Each structure stands twice: as structure tokens, then as C-alpha cells.
Amino acid sequence: MTLRWYGSKFDTVTLKQIRQIPGVKGVITTLYDTQPGEVWTREAIRALKEEVEAAGLHIAGIESVNVHDAIKTGAPDRDYYIDNYIQCLENLGEEGIKLVCYNFMPVFDWTRTELARELEDGSTALAYTQDAVDALDPEKMFESIAGDMNGTV
């Protein structure tokens, strides 16, 4: 079993805490201090791997190598960013990471209308309601997202 880990700079849950959960052997993570379109170096990938492995876990996959908007929109400079994306995937593979979750969502990357909807068993989950999004003014939507991040990136 794996858990999502937002990195030592951004996650309030440490790898040591994750390691204490019975059955958890790895994490799904990413390089949060890189910009879309930037090539991930093997050194940066290796440093992330070493940090996770030092805690007794492994990187089960990456979510995600963010796709530059030039690729999503077919802009004239898209080929440059496609080449960078390919290099990122090659570097990940060379460092032994074989799973990448792809994210091609435009503009807001991902959007949820609730970050902690309570479920019947008392646990919480992310939720998305299209009617709530349709009723939002785009500027108010951005303000809501920016102001309600609850510690997430």
C-alpha cells in the first residue's frame, strides 16, 4: 500500500509517520519545487529517492510531472516542452521510477469543491460538484482555491 506524500517542504505528515502505518511500504510523490516544463535532473530525482528510502519506504510512482500549458494548447513552443517532458520521463526511468500519473488538466490543474467532505464512516475525502463550480465567478473561484488550500500545494 502507498500514500501520497507532498514532500518534506510541503507536507505536515513526515515520512517517519507514514512508515508507522501498518502495510504502507511506499509513497506517491513528485518534485514540488519544479515548474511545469522544467527538466527534472537525475540528481534531483535521486535525492528525492534517497530521502524516501532513508525512511524505509520506496517511491511507488510520481504524480505528476506537470505538463506545460504550451503542450496542452498546442502553442508554437510546444515541441521544446515536449522534449523536456520526454527527458523527465527518461530520467525517472533511469532512476528506477516506472510509474507516472499523467495530468493534462488546464489552468487550475485540479479543482475540488470540497477538500474534506465527511463520509458515512467519519472519514473525509475530496469532492467535486459541477453545479457548485458552474455557479462561481472565475475570479471568486480562484480566490476560493487560493484561500482554502488547507496546507496543500
What annotation goes with each model-predicted range?
Residues 71-153:
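Active-site acidic/histidine proton-transfer and metal-coordination neighborhood
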Residues 21-42, 63-74:
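N-terminal substrate-binding region of glycoside hydrolase catalytic domains
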Residues 3-13, 31-44, 79, 107-110:
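Acidic-and-aromatic substrate-binding clefts and catalytic sites of carbohydrate-active enzymes
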Residues 15-23, 40-60, 90-94:
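Acidic (Asp/Glu)-rich catalytic clusters
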Residues 1-16, 55, 63-65, 81:
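Short N-terminal secondary-structure initiator segments
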Residues 24-28, 48-51, 81-83, 122-124:
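Short, surface-exposed linear patches
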Residues 11-30, 131, 136, 140:
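Short, charge-rich amphipathic segments
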